[in-house]
């Protein structure tokens, strides 16, 4: 799905080469910031959901799953990329190269599949509210999470058979080489990027249409209201989707163009654009936790509590929330009728 061409395989030898020293320093700085924010931010997300009953609902199980996908790259592939930058080449051997490439793909495909699952969850919650509690009870939600990750693993395993996980010195990464097989690369981009984004777009368009319809009905009879907080909660996950598309779109479309006609297209793509598209994609893994903190009041308050309690670590695992749902039960679904208010929760 994710990666344009690569310059060669890693067979255990030292592979050198890459951008100039100044550019490499900039890439290292971006990656260090990404790793720090990724680890701290997504740890805050997971702790927030574990600690606060108000955040424990079916929708946020997918948010935690998305955070896990973002954490995967920060704890293994990104540090290896940093090492390659500092050594001006890959020195960790073929096994680490293959594992790094696999985990990178697992994280990216896991992210887009979880974003798709979140969109479907929001769509069912808003547009099919009467059936939401049955569709997204705890048991079903856990099954959906397992299905999401199973599909993710199935999607990435073929890379080993195609031989597409290779080291690319331009980006100091072991990654998916789009030029190995044109048909496979096109399939990967379509199935792992275009189709999920199309599903997400459909779900959010349907939600927007319903919200607009409810607003118009409010103006007509003055009996309904959609709270600003409800709209912000929906917008949080919409912004997560938009940022993912913006960060990963250039890399996918460059890779798709290169795979269709490598000899004609690849020479016309500047190396700086290729490298920039990659590190834009890498940077995306640290953004989601920041978005939750900026746009969702419950997450923001819990972030503050956790940060203030770092002086007393034992308090981190004490549930301080009051009210809300018990355990991980689904919240009551809103009925969107002429006499009911549309509730939109994260």
Swiss-Prot record:
UniProt membrane topology term: Multi-pass membrane protein
Transmembrane segments: 27-47, 61-81, 100-120, 140-160, 185-205, 238-258, 272-292
Annotated glycosylation sites: 7
Annotated tissue distribution: Expressed in optic tectum, neostriatum, hypothalamus, thalamus and pineal gland, less in cerebellum and retina.
Highest rank taxon of the organism: Eukaryota
Localisation per UniProt entry: Cell membrane
The organism's taxonomic lineage, starting at the top: Eukaryota, Metazoa, Chordata, Craniata, Vertebrata
Keywords: Cell membrane, Disulfide bond, G-protein coupled receptor, Glycoprotein, Membrane, Receptor, Transducer, Transmembrane, Transmembrane helix
Annotated segments matching region Disordered: 326-346
Gene Ontology MF terms in the entry: G protein-coupled receptor activity; melatonin binding; melatonin receptor activity
Protein name: Melatonin receptor type 1C
Cytoplasmic side: 48-60, 121-139, 206-237, 293-346
Sequence similarity: Belongs to the G-protein coupled receptor 1 family.
Biological source species: Gallus gallus (Chicken)
Compositional bias annotation for Polar residues: 335-346
GO cellular component, one term: nucleoplasm
């Amino acid at each position: 799905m994710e990666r344009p061409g690569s310059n060669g395989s890693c067979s255990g030898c030292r592979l050198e080469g890459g951008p100039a020293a100044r550019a490499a320093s900039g890439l290292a700085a971006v990656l260090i910031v990404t790793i720090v924010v990724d680890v701290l931010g997504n740890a805050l997300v997971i702790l927030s959901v574990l600690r606060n009953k108000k955040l424990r609902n079916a929708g946020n199980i997918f948010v935690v799953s998305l955070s896990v996908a973002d954490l995967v790259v920060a704890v293994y592939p990104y540090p290896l990329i940093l090492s390659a930058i500092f050594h001006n080449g890959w020195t960790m051997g073929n096994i680490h190269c293959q594992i790094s490439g696999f985990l990178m793909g697992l994280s990216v495909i896991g992210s887009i599949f979880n974003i798709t699952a979140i969109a479907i969850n929001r769509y069912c919650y808003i547009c099919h509210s009467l059936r939401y509690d049955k569709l997204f009870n705890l048991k079903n939600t856990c099954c959906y999470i397992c299905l999401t990750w199973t599909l993710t693993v199935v999607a990435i395993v073929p890379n080993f058979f195609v031989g597409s996980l290779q080291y690319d010195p331009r980006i100091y990464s072991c990654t998916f080489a789009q030029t190995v097989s044109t048909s496979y690369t096109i399939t990967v981009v379509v199935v792992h990027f275009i189709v999920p984004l199309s599903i997400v777009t459909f779900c959010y368009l349907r939600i927007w249409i319903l919200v607009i319809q409810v607003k118009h009905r409010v103006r007509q009879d003055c009996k309904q209201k959609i709270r600003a907080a409800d709209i912000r909660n929906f917008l949080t996950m919409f912004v997560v989707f938009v940022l993912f598309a913006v960060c990963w779109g250039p890399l996918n479309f460059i890779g798709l163009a290169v795979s269709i006609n490598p000899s004609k297209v690849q020479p016309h793509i500047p190396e700086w654009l290729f490298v920039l598209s990659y590190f834009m994609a890498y940077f995306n893994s640290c953004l989601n936790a920041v978005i939750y903190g900026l746009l969702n009041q419950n997450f923001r308050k819990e972030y503050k509590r956790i940060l203030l309690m770092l002086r007393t670590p034992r308090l981190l695992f004490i549930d301080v929330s009051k009210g809300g749902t018990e355990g991980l039960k689904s919240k009551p679904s809103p009925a969107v009728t002429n006499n009911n208010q549309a509730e939109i929760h994260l």
